[in-house]
Amino acid sequence: MKYFYFVIFIFNFMFSQSWYNHPELEWQTIETEHFLIHYHEETTRSGQETAAVAEKIYEPITSFYEFEPDSKTHIIIQDTDDISNGAAYYYDNKILISALPLDYDLRGSHRWLNNVITHEFTHIV
């Protein structure tokens, strides 16, 4: 019985990681002075806007808190789920943003991406 649980554990670990990283997507990276923006084809516009917003908010946030990250912060933009959310991982210097397309009909005129990038980067700093 222990062997059975061990095999289940190993298979679960192996397959959960490949699902999470979405190896079926072709990831691209935009490098700016302070950030590495990772995105896939469906989030190209979001990736480009993220790069502009992130650089715009970098100086005000880092000067306010008098702290700058030691290395470039990674921002990952994905559209693999039907949610809009963000998360900051301080120890990894990484921000994950689950974003619906910018031209989504129900989005309205609210600049959600600007707010979430500012909010999550503040957690990093």
What kind of region is each of these model predictions?
Residues Q17-V125:
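Juxtacatalytic substrate-recognition/specificity segment
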